[in-house]
Amino acid sequence: MPRINIGLTDEQRQGVINLLNQDLADSYLLLVKTKKYHWDVVGPQFRSLHQLWEEHYEKLTENIDAIAERVRTLGGYPIGSMEGFLQLATLKEHAGDVPSATGMVANLVQDHEQLIRNLRDHVDRSGDEFQDQGTADFLTGLMEEHEEIAWMLRSFIEGQPIEPNGTQPATETKTPVGV
């Protein structure tokens, strides 16, 4: 790591860089999943979700670039391979799975909420453990963006029953008496 004199030790900077690289990995997996759902969504909400997810993956792309640049600002190198992303990410892929539109939304809510929990922890650790208030502030902004996205996605499926796997439960059709 190059010698940088910004009021943080090499150990503090490396600790924050490690956190940022995990956030970068999770953001990349979420970007890929969001794009995949953008391509695969079908049904009556196609246009709404297709457009919403385009906005989301464009924002994720901006955030990924900002995270990588923050790593470089601190003298580190951002991970940049799928192997590296998969090793560091806390989010999981759903390879070969094409859920319903509601299932896609539910999966993305879970992923954004996981990222929010991770970012909340990383904000605290950046500030308290590593004394890097700049990165803590940066991560707070990212966390707030994910909170808003999760809220929008949750609002889309609010009131709809959803199984833990993101599917809607089968419902019985009841024929009215006398029909």
Curated annotation (Swiss-Prot):
Which molecular function term from Gene Ontology is one that the record holds? ferric iron binding
Q: Which SUPFAM superfamilies does the entry mention?
A: Ferritin-like (SSF47240)
Region entry Disordered: which residue ranges? 160-179
User: InterPro entries, from UniProt?
Assistant: DPS_DNA-bd (IPR002177), DPS_DNA-bd_CS (IPR023188), Ferritin-like (IPR012347), Ferritin-like_SF (IPR009078), Ferritin_DPS_dom (IPR008331)
Query: What are the Polar residues biased-composition ranges?
Result: 165-179
Record-linked PANTHER family: DNA PROTECTION DURING STARVATION PROTEIN, GENERAL STRESS PROTEIN 20U
| Protein family according to the UniProt entry | Belongs to the Dps family.
Task: Name it.
Answer: Uncharacterized low temperature-induced protein all0458
The organism of origin for this protein? Nostoc sp. (strain PCC 7120 / SAG 25.82 / UTEX 2576)
